[in-house]
Structure formats: C-alpha cells, structure tokens
Amino acid sequence: MCYTSGTTGNPKGVLYSHRSTVLHAMSGALPDGLQVSARDAILPVVPMFHVNAWGLPYSAAMTGAKLVFPGPAMDGKSIYELMEAEKVNFAAGVPTVWQMLLSHVQANKLRFSSLQRTVIGGSACPPAMITAFHDVYGVEVVHAWGMTEISPLGTVCTLRNKHLLLSAEEQLKVRMKQGRSIYGVDMKIVDDAGRDLPWDGVACGDLLVKGPWVCSEYFKGEGGSPLVNGWFPTGDVATIDRDGFMRITDRSKDVIKSGGEWISSIDIENIAMAHPAVAMAACIGIKHPKWDERPIIAVMKKQDADVSREALLAFYEGRAAKWQIPDDVVFVDAIPLGGTGKMQKSKLRELLKDYRLPNT
C-alpha cells in the first residue's frame, strides 16, 4: 500500500498486489518504458514514501541495475556530488529537484561526467529546462506521467524514428508531451458526458486509464470504487495525438476558466520559467466579476536576480494569446511544496485568499 501525496485532497491508501507490482516492474524496464538494464546506475531522487519507491527500485532489482539512494539532503549540490561519486547515468525526479540541480551546475560552471538521461514526472517540465539539459550538458530529458493509483508509471515519452528527422524545435514539441502508454496500460479521453474523444492532438478531455496495475480500490474502501465502467478517472485534462502521444494540459482542479475559455496553468507557468530571472512559478485563477476567473502568476526569483512585474508580463507578449496573459505577477519568497517536491496550489490559494486583482 502507498498513500497518495494529498496535493489536491486528503491522502488515500492505494492497494497494490504482488502481481501488479511485478507486471509494472517488467513493463517499466522495457525499451519503450524506462529502458532499465544491468548497465545502469539509477538514482531515484524521491523520498521512499513516494510512489516511485514502488516503481524504479523494482525494475532495477529485476534487471540487476545499480540502485543509488539519495540522502536526506535534496539540494542541487548534494545531488550533484552523489551523482558524480556513484557514476549515476540515469536519474528520476520532479522538476523542482532538477531545477535546483541545474542552478547549482550553472552557477559553479560544472559538467556531468556520467549522467546521460533523466526522467521527469510529477508535474510538467518547463521547455527551457529540457533545452538546457540537452543542449548544454548532453543529458536526455524524458517526460513520463503517472500517479500513485498507477503504481506509478502510465506513459513515457520516447521518440519514434520519424521524430529523429525533425528539427530541434519540432523535437522539443514532442518531448514536451507526456508520451505513449507503456505496455499494459490503456488510455482514452472523454468529454463531460463521458463520450470518447478523437486522438487528433486537438480534442481535449478528461484522461481515463485502465490496466493490471491501475488502482481498483482504496484502503478500507474509502470513497468506494474509483472506477467508472472499468476506467480510472485520473483528474487530468489531456489531448492524445494520432501517434498515441498524450499531453497533459492541466489538472482538472487547476485549469482556469476565463470568459468561457479554458486557460492552461501549465502553459502559463512554462513561459514564466523560461525567463532567466525566474526560479519557480505557479499559476492560479482568481475570481473576476466579469470573466469568472483570471490567471495570476506567483513567482520566486533566482538568487541575486531582479525582474519587475512589467518586464515579466511583457515577456508573455508573442508567447501567449493576449487573453491568456496573467493579470498580475505576485513575487513570493517560496512556493509551497509537498514532501515529494510537487507544488501545492491549494496552499498557495490559501496564502493568496485575500488577494484582489488590479482594477476590480
């Protein structure tokens, strides 16, 4: 059993079986999964109470890979020194961890002697981070998606042969997706009425999954069966293209509805994270008397960096539609994070509960 992180609600105990764990480990180790082999030295940069403790460690043991555990310190310096000491070539974690690592390496003009590949999940990885790791340090960044209820792995973004012929810019667009479902997992997107939506890369709907390691019940039956006609509702909003590559557009609880149009908080955050002065950013919706909701962006600046509200809002011009640009920038000392490193937007909303939009 593993408890959910409680990022969007109360933690629930997810029940696993020996069979589901073995099947998940086998599928995760496949070439179109996490590509785990005995040649790897793997560092999962997550606490052992995290669901990844049910994933990579078992795939590593199954294939004979070296498994390196992080210590209590999750800062960039500690992670870098551990990677170098143990010759880690494959690591996995959430974007906040890799941002700290990247900042440490950049600030100290360091290089990676062994790291070849990192898998990023938990939340969307900013394009600027993928580009920096790949272009500057030669480290492949692989997007993956999953959740505690999926043991956790559901999709991995491994490029197909035809993608290797694309330009770097076009390849980045593919790498930004969460990828194709691994062997054993089925997925689909549906509209509000539960009708299947097409895999055209345009239609956007609620993401549902099923498979032999997908949760069918919670500890003590909390909340009843989570399944709907055999499918697990993930709480994510996504698109799926013709090649089966899925892209999370937002959590259903985080998407912002403004004037009848949906605004992806992830897209707004990714643009802010591309600014050289921004260390971390979180987008939330604020009630608006006319438009229902409007986005604002909470920003934590990099150490010794300086940027104004006006400069950040100007940074969005040409990168987002005018109606998608945040109405305001709120500078914060820190953005609330959970024990697994994921942003806790519920706490951020609580901190900003008395905030009022300009000109309202």
Where do the model's predicted regions map?
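Conserved AMP-binding A3 loop
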Residues: M1-L23
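Conserved S/T- and glycine-rich ATP-binding loop of Class I adenylate-forming
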Residues: T4-T7, L15, I42, M48, ...
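Conserved AMP-binding/adenylation subdomain of ANL enzymes
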Residues: V22-A41, F49-N89, H104, T155, ...
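Conserved AMP-binding
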Residues: V45-H50, S123
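Gly/Ser/Thr-rich phosphate-binding loop
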Residues: M62, A85-G93, L102-K173, D186, ...
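AMP-binding/adenylate-forming catalytic core of the ANL superfamily
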Residues: A91, G211, S216-E217, V237-Q324, ...
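Conserved ANL (AMP-binding/adenylate-forming) active-site segment centered on the GW(Y/F)…HTG consensus within
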Residues: G138, A168-R175, R195, D200-V202, ...
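Conserved beta-loop-beta connector loops within the AMP-binding
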Residues: S181-L208, R242-D243, A305-R309, Q344
